[in-house]
């Protein structure tokens, strides 16, 4: 949720507490870096910007691996390890909940380009799913490792929506935890 850049002066940020500025990278394990590279670079459009062939001791044994980085527009990256010994680290679980995912911000044209490349590569409407959440429109797809990705386009008035959400976030959470599970998303198409 981009809306506006976070600062340490936000009313909900603890005074004087410095926050990280952005994600550097989010790393996962794969058993096939070439299939993973093809998906992220050729279909999604994230360039491979670094590949580290490594041998290191962590925590108590030598590990031989390759670590790749696929760059997003803000300079952050999605990263993938492949280990010489596949038993050294488990890959991404293929049976994870669809609620466990990485959401990437993009504009409509980029989202459509990604969808077009996926369709061109044979991804069906059930493999690459569009969903209108009201405050954003999302494209969901699993990568070849089973990792769920979301490509999100915020609505134009997202900064105002986020201001409203910031003002009520703690109250809504307390209400929900107390058992009142009434939806507060009046932006969904089914509410209009």
List each language-model region with its residue ranges.
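A short, polar/proline- and glycine-enriched secondary-structure boundary/capping micro-motif
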Residues: 89-93, 160-163
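Short glycine-/small-residue motifs
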Residues: 77-80, 150-151
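Short, well-ordered beta-strand micro-motif
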Residues: 69-71, 82, 140-142
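Vicinal oxygen chelate
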Residues: 5-8, 14, 21, 33-34, ...
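Core segments of cupin and vicinal oxygen chelate
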Residues: 29-77
